[in-house]
Amino acid sequence: MIKNLWNLGLKTADLDADLDFLQKVGATIVLRDTLPVEDDRLDYAIVRLGGVRLLLFPNVIFEDQVPGGVAPGLTHAVFEVDDLDAEYARIKDLGGQVLIEPRFVQAGFGSRRIAFFRSPGGMVFEVMQILESKVD
């Protein structure tokens, strides 16, 4: 079952400019790193603002799964789960369209297993099982 909202994902056209802006607004940078993804690396940052984690990327991991690409702005919600395999099967059985099948990711935030879905109405969300956390 879904435990909680872990973060909101946002695509930005200019990561440095948005980080500067968000710090001025009151955000704290928790982590700035790169995420190895297949044959590429994605720059990202995690900030905390108003008690919420925001994960900022110039490109989102599911970009190639969305016709026409993904516009800058809010892209998806990330929900923490205890058992990714069980939750993946449950959401798929309920009609969630799989965008990214379960996979292992590791970077400055720690290690996780993740999967991405699109709801019947088009909402994109991620389910994530934290294996090791290096950020609060």
Label the predicted regions.
Residues M1, N4-D14, L35, D43-R48, V66-D136, ...:
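Vicinal oxygen chelate
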Residues N59-F62, I130-E132:
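Acetyl-CoA-dependent GNAT
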